[in-house]
């Protein structure tokens, strides 16, 4: 018997799974996997003679077919990430954490180190996911924010300098400033430093000290260390996270980010200072 063309039969099975009742769908799956050679051969012959059949089925069930394809894509992405993360766990990362404010318990089982930019849309999205994770895992998670603005002299870079400087006075106020920058990203982009100063003043920051600290060598050294850490890790864009030693690139969907936290929590301690 001639070997059945797998892509053709698989597409047939996909369409039939979307369109038919469960017993029929099981037969389609049997054909797609080759467990029923006679049925597979019959389907191949039919579709070669009447290819419009499968096109009609796909059109009539386009949403179901897309859902099936998306589920497969999501499973593949999850698998690829888990493979990467298992490798990451065997490759400890070292970054500078001294003099950085910590949101949460410093001895938390999972330390999330974020390389981010206050003006980045995807960073804003990712910050919401991190907050959701902190609510879910509580004291098991802490966050450290490292600065990687696209434009060091633009609003993102200026906001980074202010965050570090405010943290020298009061770490709680620095994290409130962090929230204000991300939640008002449009104003940050449009108004720049005047909005940044207004936000700091509204938080009750000592503005005279802030004006000195923001231009101090201590602040510039911390920001320079963040840049060096990013280069050492090969960070190519923001957001970028170390979840202990696991690397998370981009604004990963919350469910996948949660998978990284679960794996890190059950694995090794990471990201040594």
Q: Model segments located where?
A:
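Bacterial Sec-dependent N-terminal signal peptides
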Residues: 1-11
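C-terminal cap of thioredoxin/glutaredoxin-like
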Residues: 2, 34-46, 64, 68-69, ...
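Bacterial N-terminal signal peptides
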Residues: 11-21
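Stable alpha-helical elements in mature extracytoplasmic
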Residues: 39-42, 50, 54, 126-129, ...
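Short acidic/histidine-centered micro-motifs embedded in hydrophobic/aromatic stretches
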Residues: 60, 180-184, 213, 217
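Structural alpha/beta surface segment adjacent to cysteine/selenocysteine redox centers
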Residues: 113, 124-201, 231-236
């Amino acid at each position: 018997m001639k070997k059945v063309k797998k892509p053709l039969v698989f597409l047939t099975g996909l369409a039939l799974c979307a369109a038919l009742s469960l017993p029929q769908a099981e037969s389609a799956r049997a054909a797609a996997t080759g467990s029923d050679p006679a049925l597979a051969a019959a389907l191949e012959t039919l579709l070669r003679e009447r290819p419009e059949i499968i096109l009609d089925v796909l059109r009539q069930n386009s949403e179901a077919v897309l859902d099936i394809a998306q589920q497969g894509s999501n499973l593949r992405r999850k698998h690829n990430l888990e493979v990467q993360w298992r490798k990451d766990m065997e490759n400890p990362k070292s970054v500078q954490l001294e003099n950085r404010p910590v949101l949460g318990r410093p001895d938390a089982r999972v330390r999330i180190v974020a390389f981010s930019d206050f003006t980045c849309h995807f960073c804003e999205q990712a910050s919401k996911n991190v907050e959701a994770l902190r609510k879910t895992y509580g004291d098991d998670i802490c966050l450290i924010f490292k600065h990687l603005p696209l434009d060091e002299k633009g609003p993102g870079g200026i906001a980074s300098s202010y965050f570090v400087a405010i943290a020298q006075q009061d770490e709680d106020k620095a994290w409130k400033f962090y929230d204000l920058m991300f939640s008002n990203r449009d104003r940050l982009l449009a108004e720049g430093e005047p909005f940044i100063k207004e936000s700091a003043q509204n938080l009750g920051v000592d503005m005279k000290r802030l004006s000195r600290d923001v231009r101090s060598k201590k602040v510039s050294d911390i920001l320079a260390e963040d840049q060096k850490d990013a280069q050492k890790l090969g960070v190519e864009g923001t957001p970028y996270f170390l979840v202990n030693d696991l690397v998370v690139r981009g604004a990963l969907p919350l469910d996948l980010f949660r998978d990284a936290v679960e794996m890190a929590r059950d694995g090794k301690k990471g990201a040594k200072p």
